[in-house]
Structures are given as structure tokens and as C-alpha cells.
């Protein structure tokens, strides 16, 4: 069996570089000029002065300029419109001869200005990039005309961000701890369970030591999760994309393969003798794994296999980005991380009490967790491999697991039937995955569906690909939105990335459904591809203040976003159809 496992693991380095069509370790979407994010190119601030007037100020970075004719003040009484100062003449490929502002722009609204105001502006860079139109809602207080597209309804992420602003810290921490408990059972959080269980069981730690190890893992995971969330929100960067770079995922997949080797008895993973003796002296007889090692593994889990983009996470990030209150937002994210880790901690520590006392069976358990480590590496490799290649690798892993289970069953007096049945199931499933991979399957749960689809003459995902127009540049998005507005069309913006597992699931289980495609007839479907971590992707994300994919945004026939109807995170077909019907009815 060791030979089979070794051969399987030797495939991983080559497969991790097998992404078709490009160099795996080449930076994606690299450009010759890296432009400033729009919020840094045009820094906007406003304040109400002592005399009641409202001062609006744009600080414009060198090499950038704002268009005079692109300034908008929606919701402001025409009699209160500000007097625009003269600009400098400028001619470019985007708007021809125009008046533009450089360095700074200050405007003053009279004291009578009140209510909801939506500002709009647009600028470009001398180096050749034209940013998409920007907008910001201002609450000037008092009463006044409502800005277009506003209502009392808010999206889930907005509601959570609002609760953070309105509520006290203790309530916010409790709320997000509870949300974390729910997120612990999301599919993208489940890979953390075998990592933590393998750590505790593989160390042979007792109940108390196991609790300390699990606590160290969960605590460090929550700390890293909170820290990265705060950094991402304050810097406005696409941190998800950075953490999903091929070299990083490939490195950590190799690390989990390396961690699996000791579980199969290839070697014993331990510190150098001198350092080990010193630590043994300091620990004074404590048995079990290293707390520092558990903390390091927890940090890696927070980086790579933590929860995906969901409404609670988006709400916390939106709150930090809007208020700049990194301390409050960081504590909330830390509480969310603790909530995610709590069920894992209970399953590993409390569940371990029902296991028999240490003995020869531990070698069997270590082998099980070795396969779980290999499965984690397989999951990490998904964004790097084509779907068929990834499914084929999973099928090979299942066949090796089936052989191991059947081989183990022959040497057991008890539970032989259980292991034999498991081996047969794994073997059949692995064979099905290999057969499906040979035909180009893209769903590991239904690997043979590709043959049924071929008999019908089409694949389910082909219709989904054809229905959506992929957009990766802000200028193309502007053209599509303008065309939809001219035709009075609804628009669905689907933020997507190749490394986003939830995006792929929704592509197959939502947008490939005939009833979903039928319901979306007449809607302009745009897939905003933010796979690459470059200026264009950052602009697409910042356009609607989206923290990351998957996110679904509805644009009405008049060109305004229905912000309260935004969907963040994974949704099933039934939920999506109900949501779209309600959105269409409300207009």
C-alpha cells in the first residue's frame, strides 16, 4: 500500500503545474502600468461647516484628472446646485474636448441642502486608463428629495454592517459568534475538521493536551482570520485573489502531502534532537503535540481553507471599509472566527472521549487522517487544475483508499464488513470519477453525468457559459450597462473567479438549470471575471464595493443598482429564483 500512496503523491508536483494554456507560476493579468485604485486617485471627503454649508472636496493624485461634465448631484434641488469653477481644457480619446480638474476640487453646497444626496464623478489617468463612473450617497440630514434607487430595504450585508454601527460591541460579538457557528458547517469550512482531528489524533495527546492543542489551533486561526480581514478592508485589495495565487496554493498542497507522509509510516516528523531535548526539558513531561505547531497549522487553515465569502463576512468588511474602525471590526471578525472554530473544537475534544484507549488501533486512525490530509491537498489544488484533471486525481486517490480499506478488512476480526463495504464504495466512486474525467466531467459528485449529457447532444454547463457574457475590463462593463439602459433591460452582474469554488458550484447547480435560464430570459447576464489580481479586477470590485466573489448584483432598467437585493455568497437554484421573482416584482 505504501508503494501506491508514494506513486500517487509523486503525481502531485507535476499535476500542480498542469493548468492548460499558461505558465502556472507566471503572474496572471500582469500589466505594464499598475494604476492607482480609484479611491486613491480621487480621494473624496465632505463636511458640514459651522455656518451650515456643506463642503465637498476631491484630492486628485498627480497624473490624474476629473471631468467637469461628469459631476452629478442626484437628489439635490436644482436651485441648490453648486457653481462649478472653470477647469482646464483637455482632449483625450474617451470624451474628446473637455474641461477637467487636477490636483484638487472644492465645491460648496448652501446650508439649505438636506436629505439624501447621491454624488457622481468620473476621472481618468494621463497614462491611458479611464475609470468607471463613481458614486457616493450622502445623508445631509433634515428632509429633502430622496436619491434615486433608495428605499427602506437593505441587503443582508448592509444590515449586518448597520447593526455593527448601531449596536454595542458586546451584542455585535455575540451576534457574529453565532453566525460563525453556522458558517462552521458550510462546505468551504469543512476541510478544517480533518486538519484539526489529524493534529490531535496523530499526536497521541490525552484529553487535556488535546484540548490545549485544539484551542491553540482555533485561537490562531481566528486571529489570522481577523487580521487578514482588517487588512483587506482597510487596503481595499482583493486579498482572496492574492491568497489563491498558484505558487501559494501549490506550496501548501505540497505541505499537506508532506504532513500526510508520517501518518503512513514513511518517516517520523520531529524536531532536531538538540532542540527536541531542550523542549522536552522545558515541558517537564508533557505529552502530545506542540502548541506552536498547532498554532502554525491553525494560521495556515485561516489563510487557505477558511470560510469563503458570505454575508456575515461581507458585512464585517463593509463596516470596516466604511468607518475605518479596525479595532471594532477586527474584534467582530475574531468572534466570527471563534464561532467557526468552536464546533471543530468540540468534535475533536469531546468526541475523543468516546474513542477506545490508545493501542494498535491508533496506527489505523493515523492512516485515516493521512488520507484526510491528502484530501485537503486535493481540495487546495482545485483552482490550479482543469476540472477533468482534478476529478481524475480525486478518482486515483479514492482507488488507493479503496485498496487500503479492503486490505485492512482482511486483517480485522471486528468491523471487517464495515471496512469491506467502505472499500467497495470508494472503489466504485473512484472508478466512476476516472471514467468521467476521461470524458471531460466537471462534477465530482456526478462524474458520469457527462455521458448522459453527451447522449442529449449538449452539456449542462455549455448553456450557462453561452448565456453569460464574460467581462474583465471596466470599459467593457460601461458599454454593456449603457446598452442595457438604452434597451430598458435588467442586468445581472455575477462576480466570478476561477479560484472561487462557490462560483463553480453555482455555475453548475444554479445557472445551468433550465428553469433558471428560462426565468432570466430578457436579462442581460454579465459575468465579471476578477480571477487576476490586477488593476482591472480591483476596479470591477470597487465599482460596487464588492469584497469578493461570489456576489450577484441586480441593475434595474433605468441603470440603477437594486442595492437591497444584492446576494453575497453561495445560493441554491430555488433561493435564486425566489429572490429574482421578488426583485422583479418590486421593480
Swiss-Prot record:
<dbReference type="GO" id="GO:0009055">
    <property type="term" value="F:electron transfer activity"/>
</dbReference>
<dbReference type="InterPro" id="IPR036929">
    <property type="entry name" value="DsbDN_sf"/>
</dbReference>
<keyword id="KW-1015">Disulfide bond</keyword>
<dbReference type="GO" id="GO:0047134">
    <property type="term" value="F:protein-disulfide reductase [NAD(P)H] activity"/>
</dbReference>
<keyword id="KW-0520">NAD</keyword>
<dbReference type="InterPro" id="IPR017937">
    <property type="entry name" value="Thioredoxin_CS"/>
</dbReference>
<feature type="transmembrane region" description="Helical">
    <location>
        <begin position="417"/>
        <end position="437"/>
    </location>
</feature>
<keyword id="KW-0249">Electron transport</keyword>
<dbReference type="InterPro" id="IPR035671">
    <property type="entry name" value="DsbD_gamma"/>
</dbReference>
<keyword id="KW-0732">Signal</keyword>
<feature type="transmembrane region" description="Helical">
    <location>
        <begin position="217"/>
        <end position="237"/>
    </location>
</feature>
<dbReference type="GO" id="GO:0005886">
    <property type="term" value="C:plasma membrane"/>
</dbReference>
<feature type="topological domain" description="Cytoplasmic">
    <location>
        <begin position="405"/>
        <end position="416"/>
    </location>
</feature>
<dbReference type="InterPro" id="IPR036249">
    <property type="entry name" value="Thioredoxin-like_sf"/>
</dbReference>
<feature type="disulfide bond" description="Redox-active">
    <location>
        <begin position="188"/>
        <end position="308"/>
    </location>
</feature>
<feature type="topological domain" description="Cytoplasmic">
    <location>
        <begin position="268"/>
        <end position="299"/>
    </location>
</feature>
<dbReference type="Pfam" id="PF13899">
    <property type="entry name" value="Thioredoxin_7"/>
</dbReference>
<feature type="signal peptide">
    <location>
        <begin position="1"/>
        <end position="18"/>
    </location>
</feature>
<feature type="topological domain" description="Cytoplasmic">
    <location>
        <begin position="194"/>
        <end position="216"/>
    </location>
</feature>
<feature type="topological domain" description="Cytoplasmic">
    <location>
        <begin position="352"/>
        <end position="360"/>
    </location>
</feature>
<keyword id="KW-1003">Cell membrane</keyword>
<comment type="similarity">
    <text>Belongs to the thioredoxin family. DsbD subfamily.</text>
</comment>
<dbReference type="GO" id="GO:0045454">
    <property type="term" value="P:cell redox homeostasis"/>
</dbReference>
<feature type="disulfide bond" description="Redox-active">
    <location>
        <begin position="500"/>
        <end position="503"/>
    </location>
</feature>
<keyword id="KW-0813">Transport</keyword>
<protein>
    <recommendedName>
        <fullName>Thiol:disulfide interchange protein DsbD 2</fullName>
        <ecNumber>1.8.1.8</ecNumber>
    </recommendedName>
</protein>
<dbReference type="InterPro" id="IPR013766">
    <property type="entry name" value="Thioredoxin_domain"/>
</dbReference>
<dbReference type="GO" id="GO:0015035">
    <property type="term" value="F:protein-disulfide reductase activity"/>
</dbReference>
<dbReference type="Pfam" id="PF02683">
    <property type="entry name" value="DsbD_TM"/>
</dbReference>
<dbReference type="Pfam" id="PF11412">
    <property type="entry name" value="DsbD_N"/>
</dbReference>
<feature type="topological domain" description="Periplasmic">
    <location>
        <begin position="238"/>
        <end position="246"/>
    </location>
</feature>
<feature type="topological domain" description="Periplasmic">
    <location>
        <begin position="19"/>
        <end position="172"/>
    </location>
</feature>
<dbReference type="InterPro" id="IPR003834">
    <property type="entry name" value="Cyt_c_assmbl_TM_dom"/>
</dbReference>
<keyword id="KW-0812">Transmembrane</keyword>
<feature type="topological domain" description="Periplasmic">
    <location>
        <begin position="382"/>
        <end position="383"/>
    </location>
</feature>
<feature type="transmembrane region" description="Helical">
    <location>
        <begin position="247"/>
        <end position="267"/>
    </location>
</feature>
<feature type="disulfide bond" description="Redox-active">
    <location>
        <begin position="124"/>
        <end position="130"/>
    </location>
</feature>
<feature type="transmembrane region" description="Helical">
    <location>
        <begin position="331"/>
        <end position="351"/>
    </location>
</feature>
<feature type="transmembrane region" description="Helical">
    <location>
        <begin position="300"/>
        <end position="320"/>
    </location>
</feature>
<feature type="topological domain" description="Periplasmic">
    <location>
        <begin position="321"/>
        <end position="330"/>
    </location>
</feature>
<feature type="transmembrane region" description="Helical">
    <location>
        <begin position="173"/>
        <end position="193"/>
    </location>
</feature>
<keyword id="KW-0676">Redox-active center</keyword>
Amino acid at each position: 500500500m505504501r508503494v501506491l500512496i508514494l506513486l500517487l503523491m509523486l503525481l502531485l508536483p507535476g499535476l500542480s503545474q498542469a493548468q492548460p494554456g499558461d505558465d502556472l507560476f507566471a503572474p496572471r493579468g500582469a500589466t505594464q502600468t499598475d494604476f492607482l485604485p480609484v479611491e486613491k486617485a480621487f480621494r473624496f471627503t465632505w463636511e458640514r461647516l459651522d455656518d451650515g454649508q456643506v463642503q465637498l472636496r476631491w484630492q486628485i493624485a498627480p497624473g490624474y484628472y476629473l471631468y467637469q461634465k461628469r459631476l452629478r448631484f442626484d437628489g439635490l434641488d436644482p436651485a441648490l446646485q453648486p457653481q462649478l469653477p472653470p477647469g482646464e481644457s483637455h482632449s483625450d480619446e474617451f470624451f474628446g474636448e473637455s474641461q477637467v480638474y487636477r490636483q484638487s476640487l472644492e465645491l460648496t453646497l448652501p446650508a439649505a441642502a438636506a436629505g439624501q444626496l447621491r454624488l457622481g464623478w468620473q476621472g481618468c489617468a494621463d497614462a491611458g486608463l479611464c475609470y468607471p463612473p463613481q458614486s457616493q450617497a450622502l445623508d445631509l440630514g433634515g428632509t429633502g428629495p430622496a436619491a434615486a434607487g433608495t428605499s427602506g430595504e437593505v441587503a443582508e450585508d448592509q444590515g449586518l454592517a448597520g447593526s455593527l454601527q448601531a449596536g454595542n460591541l458586546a451584542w455585535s460579538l455575540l451576534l457574529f459568534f453565532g453566525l460563525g457557528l453556522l458558517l462552521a458547517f458550510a462546505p468551504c469550512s469543512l476541510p478544517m475538521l480533518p486538519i484539526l482531528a489529524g493534529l490531535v489524533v496523530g499526536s497521541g495527546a490525552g484529553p487535556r493536551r488535546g484540548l490545549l492543542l485544539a484551542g491553540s489551533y482555533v485561537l490562531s486561526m481566528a486571529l489570522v482570520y481577523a487580521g487578514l480581514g482588517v487588512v483587506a478592508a482597510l487596503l481595499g485589495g482583493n486579498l482572496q485573489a492574492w491568497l489563491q495565487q498558484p505558487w501559494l496554493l501549490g506550496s501548501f498542497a505540497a505541505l499537506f502531502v508532506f504532513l500526510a507522509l508520517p501518518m503512513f509510516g514513511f518517516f517520523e516528523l520531529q524536531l532536531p534532537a538538540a532542540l527536541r531535548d531542550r523542549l522536552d526539558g522545558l515541558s517537564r513531561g508533557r505529552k502530545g503535540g506542540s502548541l506552536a505547531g498547532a498554532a502554525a497549522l491553525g494560521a495556515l487553515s485561516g489563510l487557505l481553507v477558511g470560510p469563503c465569502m458570505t454575508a456575515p463576512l461581507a458585512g464585517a468588511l463593509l463596516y470596516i471599509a466604511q468607518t475605518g474602525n479596525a479595532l471594532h471590526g477586527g474584534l467582530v471578525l475574531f468572534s466570527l472566527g471563534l464561532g467557526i472554530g468552536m464546533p471543530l473544537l468540540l468534535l475533536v475534544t469531546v468526541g475523543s472521549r468516546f474513542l477506545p484507549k490508545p493501542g494498535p488501533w491508533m496506527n489505523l486512525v493515523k492512516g485515516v487522517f493521512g488520507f484526510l490530509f491528502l484530501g485537503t491537498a486535493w481540495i487546495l489544488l482545485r483552482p490550479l487544475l482543469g476540472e477533468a484533471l482534478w476529478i481524475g486525481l480525486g478518482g486515483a486517490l479514492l482507488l488507493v483508499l479503496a485498496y487500503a480499506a479492503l486490505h485492512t478488512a482482511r486483517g480485522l476480526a471486528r468491523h471487517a464488513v464495515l471496512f469491506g463495504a467502505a472499500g467497495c464504495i470508494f472503489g466504485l466512486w473512484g472508478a466512476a470519477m476516472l471514467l468521467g474525467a476521461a470524458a471531460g466531467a466537471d462534477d465530482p459528485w456526478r462524474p458520469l453525468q457527462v455521458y448522459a449529457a453527451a447522449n442529449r447532444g449538449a452539456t449542462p454547463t455549455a448553456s450557462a457559459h453561452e448565456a453569460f457574457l464574460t467581462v474583465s475590463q471596466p470599459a467593457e462593463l460601461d458599454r454593456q450597462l449603457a446598452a442595457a439602459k438604452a434597451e430598458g433591460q435588467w442586468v445581472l452582474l455575477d462576480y466570478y473567479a476561477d479560484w472561487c469554488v462557490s462560483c463553480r458550484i453555482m455555475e453548475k447547480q444554479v445557472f445551468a438549470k433550465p428553469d433558471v435560464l428560462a426565468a432570466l430570459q430578457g436579462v442581460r447576464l454579465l459575468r465579471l471575471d476578477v480571477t487576476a489580481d490586477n488593476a482591472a479586477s480591483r476596479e470591477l470590485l470597487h465599482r460596487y464595493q464588492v469584497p469578493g466573489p461570489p456576489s450577484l448584483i441586480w441593475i434595474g432598467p433605468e441603470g440603477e443598482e437594486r442595492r437591497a437585493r444584492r446576494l453575497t455568497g453561495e445560493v441554491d437554484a430555488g433561493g435564486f429564483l425566489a429572490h429574482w421573482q421578488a426583485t422583479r416584482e418590486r421593480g
